[in-house]
């Protein structure tokens, strides 16, 4: 007897999003993100805040790569889903900047509606380390 499992479409969307993010594939990210999407990054660093609209969100993402000379990565470890459109992605953020190394686990709660990301909220396992890296 074999067990067949099917991945929820929202989980597949999030997996595609991580690949697109890590390869700076703006075409795919544009397809996956609603034009009015919101992104929320906690903390006290200059990157903390809420970003409204696809262009603002992408500008925020661009800072991650730009401030780290392209070394920033979000290495996906797990994806959890439920039927209401919510997906949780757990990943390890890594980067190098000004002689410092970032290695912080994070989860993002994604709200997916009609096949597009409408809201993303980051939660860091060590918010202090995250903020210190960007200081």
Task: Indicate where each model-derived feature is located.
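Short, low-complexity N-terminal intrinsically disordered segments enriched in polar/charged residues
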Residues: 1-35, 135
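Beta-strand elements of well-folded, non-transmembrane domains
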Residues: 22, 95-97, 112-114
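A solvent-exposed, acidic/Ser-Thr-rich amphipathic alpha-helical stretch
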Residues: 28, 34-83
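Short, solvent-exposed coil/turn segments at beta-strand boundaries
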Residues: 29-32, 82-85, 110-117
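A short, polar/proline- and glycine-enriched secondary-structure boundary/capping micro-motif
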Residues: 50, 99-101, 128-134
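Short beta-strand segments that buttress and anchor functional surface loops
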Residues: 62-63, 89-97
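Hydrophobic/aromatic beta-strand elements that line small-molecule binding cavities or substrate pockets
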Residues: 74-80, 92-94, 105-110
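Short beta-strand edge/turn micro-motifs at domain boundaries
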Residues: 108-131
């Amino acid at each position: 007897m074999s067990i067949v499992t099917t991945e929820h479409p929202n989980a597949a969307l999030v997996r595609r999003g991580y690949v697109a993010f890590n390869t700076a594939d703006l075409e795919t990210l544009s397809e996956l993100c609603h034009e009015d999407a919101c992104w929320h990054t906690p903390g006290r660093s200059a990157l903390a805040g809420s970003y409204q609209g696809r262009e603002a969100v992408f500008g925020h993402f661009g800072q991650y790569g730009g401030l780290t000379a392209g070394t920033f990565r979000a290495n996906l470890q797990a994806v959890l889903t439920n039927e209401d459109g919510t997906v949780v992605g757990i990943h390890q953020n890594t980067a190098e900047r000004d002689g410092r190394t970032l290695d912080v686990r994070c989860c993002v709660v994604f709200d997916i509606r009609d096949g597009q990301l409408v809201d993303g909220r980051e939660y860091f396992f060590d918010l202090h380390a995250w903020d210190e890296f960007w200081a």
